[in-house]
């Protein structure tokens, strides 16, 4: 069987991507990054998901992006309830570039030619490293910057959720047997994984379940507007 490295954050998108990769016959090696995020319960979720999906291997790698700063997800910066114009304060500088680079390194070591990530360009919050152009550019980089790429192995970066709405992602996850109750998406999630219900991530998640007509298993401390209107 072919091997693949999947970036597994602990959120719903990466859980669905992990299940998709397995359904395509890949031996899944899941990679989670402890980068200094304040919502550390998502890493606990990543461990739960990896166990539930019975992945071949799961690594949690430490990268201290908090020492660099520049994001409300790592710094003591207020996380807004509503998104504003431009790139939001929850953007972590170069995060996806760094994470994909780590995934690329592990892929080269284990002999995997495929990397999967859960970036989404439809319901994304304005992050530049969630755009299709970024994924295409990184795949080009991967083939230029690695020993295996130079020697002729074609490396692929897959973003199967790239053009799906959150509702479509919910349906895709259910189709592949994902237990969304194991996942954590909230930027302010507490140590037990309970979601705030107010941040942009919570709103997108709740709206996705509502639009899909599926019960949201998330434990919210405060119900998002999309659920209050049901």
Swiss-Prot record:
Coiled coil: none annotated. It comes from the Bacteria. The keyword Acyltransferase does not apply. Pathway: Purine metabolism; 7-cyano-7-deazaguanine biosynthesis. Zn(2+) binds at residues 186, 196, 199, 202. CDD domains: QueC-like. Its cofactor is Zn(2+). ATP binds at residues 8-18. Its EC number is 6.3.4.20. Keywords: ATP-binding, Ligase, Metal-binding, Nucleotide-binding, Queuosine biosynthesis, Zinc. The keyword Chloroplast does not apply. GO terms for molecular function: ATP binding; ligase activity, forming carbon-nitrogen bonds; zinc ion binding. It is an enzyme of class 6 (ligase). Pfam families: QueC. One of its GO terms (biological process) is queuosine biosynthetic process. Binds 1 zinc ion per subunit. HAMAP family: QueC (MF_01633). Catalyzes the ATP-dependent conversion of 7-carboxy-7-deazaguanine (CDG) to 7-cyano-7-deazaguanine (preQ(0)). Belongs to the QueC family. This is 7-cyano-7-deazaguanine synthase. It comes from Xylella fastidiosa (strain M12). The gene is queC.
